[in-house]
Amino acid sequence: MEQVEILRKFIQRVQAMKSPDHNGEDNFARDFMRLRRLSTKYRTEKIYPTATGEKEENVKKNRYKDILPFDHSRVKLTLKTPSQDSDYINANFIKGVYGPKAYVATQGPLANTVIDFWRMIWEYNVVIIVMACREFEMGRKKCERYWPLYGEDPITFAPFKISCEDEQARTDYFIRTLLLEFQNESRRLYQFHYVNWPDHDVPSSFDSILDMISLMRKYQEHEDVPICIHCSAGCGRTGAICAIDYTWNLLKAGKIPEEFNVFNLIQEMRTQRHSAVQTKEQYELVHRAIAQLFEKQLQLYEIHGAQKIADGVNEINTENMVSSIEPEKQDSPPPKPPRTRSCLVEGDAKEEILQPPEPHPVPPILTPSPPSAFPTVTTVWQDNDRYHPKPVLHMVSSEQHSADLNRNYSKSTELPGKNESTIEQIDKKLERNLSFEIKKVPLQEGPKSFDGNTLLNRGHAIKIKSASPCIADKISKPQELSSDLNVGDTSQNSCVDCSVTQSNKVSVTPPEESQNSDTPPRPDRLPLDEKGHVTWSFHGPENAIPIPDLSEGNSSDINYQTRKTVSLTPSPTTQVETPDLVDHDNTSPLFRTPLSFTNPLHSDDSDSDERNSDGAVTQNKTNISTASATVSAATSTESISTRKVLPMSIARHNIAGTTHSGAEKDVDVSEDSPPPLPERTPESFVLASEHNTPVRSEWSELQSQERSEQKKSEGLITSENEKCDHPAGGIHYEMCIECPPTFSDKREQISENPTEATDIGFGNRCGKPKGPRDPPSEWT
């Protein structure tokens, strides 16, 4: 058990001891009675004999006839003087932390034992004398004055001469500097005289006692020579000071035993000096004083721990500067900061060291911005989240020219004036690149086995942020993919950002150009030549997919390997073919809605390998309808994927959708037959909030808002043959999911309608707020 836990347990035990039992006595009184019974047993049964103190020649040297030194631990005097040649003095050694003779517990000198007292001081090279009583207490002589007063002439106790060189008055005690001379040799020693400790009682405050003991240990830190402690009898107050100092030395050495308790300590002391800690009040004082020492030590531990953390941060900053000069490659980060991780961005090896978190929030969504205006995805999480490292961009070269992940960002941006207010809100949320891939995940997530050569092992999620009507401009025709393609191509699952331009179209660079062109430098702009159209581009150097126009009524299948697609289209029906990916874990990747952006670093369960090593694909077609509805954000804990992926939605909920069963049609694999229409529930129209309870009472309000929005929409309108019994006006995203063609009611999906602008941010939902309240900025 660590020292901190031991100290806390002792403090709690002392606090519990103050509570009285059924007899009205607290634990202090009960424990002290046990100590007294043990001492009586020692005396009556002669367990620790006191034969030397009982001798006739030594009886007169004892201040109290019942307080005699134990023979096995008594201090023996060997220094002879002409007047005194006996070896007896009423004193005992008490062992300390480092030796058996750390303390000399003795009675206050009598008039006939002062020379014996100085003999003992000289013989055992004592430097510190602690006196815990007054010379007179309650009209009785408690101790002979064995030192001269400050400013008076030296006192001679032949053959010893004692002078007082200095005296310092402190709270409740004095510090005197004494000069001891014997046979032309002099020694300087110090007397700590505590004057406010009543006999058989305790002082009102023990802070001055602790202060005196602390200062005493500054004068003598070691135990090479004993410290002489005495009061009147050399038992009660003497034993209390010894117990406190002994425990303090243990504490400073970090050697407090796991089962430390004061009872055992004083019981052992009583086997060395008779009646050490003489009263119940003194016994309680020792507990309280030690508990206070432990509390102060705990505070020191906390301060020391904070300093260690600060030093660690400084070391991280220093190593960050060094690593920027000398980059290294490390595939596995250490479990403690500083953690390093190598990444390949545009063919350059870079080492990145996680920095301590900054106070500003993580920007949620990417918007067009000039270079260096805001941090990109490679720096956002590095600067803002120390414990959840950023996603790493990788460029994996293939036989042909590598496709740049951000090749579609190289075009200039033009913003329409009518959407300036919306874009300002988007700009406030900073930027985050939508096209990225994760190759590495921090060790703290505990991911499963990764194959870093050819396989993309994370389920990718997307965010869309736009301010004008968006539709899918083109969807590629089916193109068979060879089973030996490089599945690890970095262009997989990359998506083209949705943005706003003057016209209602977005021109996407054809994927054929990405194959034939060299890898351009990473741009900072989005492709915004035309207005409103959204295209999810799944292109790569070897598996580029042509995108035909769906607005002309040509619905086609997307045949791809390890791809996840989202179609935004005005067509009545959109048929997307999703392959059944063959993998060992039988996991099903799915698309998250814009409100449920899946942070790969926040997934509770690690994603497994999504495909075979040979890249074999078993295809299965699934009809996906495009219905007109609002972006659903109903909270639900159900997930349709066999692979558990918990999205890190900013609303902190998963988005659940339901399908409409009333207008179902037979699912057909052909491209001409319309798919079944999804059924919407009131819960799916409620915005995700910090509460799990859906607001059903606002269903009618949402219906009226959506109908008014449908009338105002200028863009494309869904065909009349769409059987939708729910109001239109939202954007419904259909997720391509590895599953049988039929959709269950528990399947997550989001309806799409291109009649509204594709503004799916938290601040702007289809151009106007659709929720019961404005979402707070803390979501981002």
UniProtKB/Swiss-Prot annotation:
Basic and acidic residues bias: start-end ranges: 521-533, 602-613, 704-725, 771-780
Biased composition (Low complexity): 622-639
Annotated binding of substrate, by residue: 36, 63-67, 199, 231-237, 278
Catalytic activity: O-phospho-L-tyrosyl-[protein] + H2O = L-tyrosyl-[protein] + phosphate
Effect after changing residue 200 to A: Decreases enzyme activity
Key word RNA-binding present: no
Residues bearing the modification Phosphothreonine: 509, 519, 569, 598, 693
Sites of Phosphoserine modification: 19, 332, 435, 449, 468, 567, 571, 596, 603, 606, 608, 613, 673, 689
List of catalytic residues: 231 (phosphocysteine intermediate)
Subcellular location as annotated: Cytoplasm; Cell junction, Focal adhesion; Cell projection, Podosome
Phenotypic consequence of residue 36 to A: Decreases enzyme activity
Transmembrane segments: none
N-acetylmethionine carried by residues: 1
Tyrosine-protein phosphatase domain mapped to chain residues: 28-293
InterPro entries hit by this protein: Prot-tyrosine_phosphatase-like, PTN12, PTN12/18/22, PTN12_cat, PTP_cat, Tyr_Pase_AS, Tyr_Pase_cat, Tyr_Pase_dom
Region (Disordered): 502-639, 657-725, 744-780
Major localisation: cytoplasm
SUPFAM superfamilies, per the entry: (Phosphotyrosine protein) phosphatases II
Keyword flag Cytoplasm: yes
PROSITE patterns: TYR_PHOSPHATASE_1, TYR_PHOSPHATASE_2, TYR_PHOSPHATASE_PTP
Subunit (UniProt): Interacts with TGFB1I1. Interacts with PSTPIP1. Interacts with PTK2B/PYK2. Interacts with LPXN. Interacts with SORBS2; this interaction greatly enhances WASF1 dephosphorylation and might mediate partial translocation to focal adhesion sites.
Protein name, UniProt field: Tyrosine-protein phosphatase non-receptor type 12
